[in-house]
């Protein structure tokens, strides 16, 4: 799963919502990286100090998934992804944010 983000406008969309094998923020061009503070809408998350990761709010991911998040299968997959992220140290201390790497290539943001 990945979030397509235009850092100039803040527009963002969740893609491949049922692929729980990867998580990333995909921006249009390499010129957009590293991300500057303030380029990610606060409703989506926050830019990590390195500008190459974004902590995306888990509740926002659920909201962006829309009706897919209502299914037991989606929730189980998301919970498993969160558990893996937790074991890997990729959650904020309060568990509200999931660390996503930033890339320009959607193929690196999926299990493909």
Regions found by a protein language model. Give the residues of each.
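Residue-identity detector for threonine
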Residues: 9, 21, 29, 39, ...
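Short glycine-rich, basic-tinged beta-strand/loop micro-motifs
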Residues: 48-68
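Short helix/strand-capping turn motifs
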Residues: 2-54
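Short, compact, well-ordered microdomains
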Residues: 64-112
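Generic detector of well-ordered alpha-helical segments enriched in charged/polar residues
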Residues: 34-41, 45, 58, 62, ...
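Generic signature of intrinsically disordered, low-complexity segments enriched in small/polar residues
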Residues: 5, 23-26, 58-60, 81, ...
């Amino acid at each position: 799963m990945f979030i397509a983000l235009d850092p100039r406008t803040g527009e963002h969309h969740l893609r491949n919502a049922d692929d729980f094998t990867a998580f990333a923020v995909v921006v249009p061009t390499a010129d957009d990286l590293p991300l500057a503070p303030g380029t990610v809408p606060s409703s989506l998350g926050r830019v990590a100090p390195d500008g190459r990761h974004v902590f995306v709010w888990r509740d926002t991911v659920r909201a962006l998934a829309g009706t897919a998040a209502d299914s037991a299968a989606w929730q189980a997959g998301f919970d498993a992804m969160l558990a893996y992220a937790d074991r890997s140290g990729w959650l904020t201390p309060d568990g509200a944010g999931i660390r996503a790497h930033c890339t320009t290539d959607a193929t690196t943001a999926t299990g493909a």
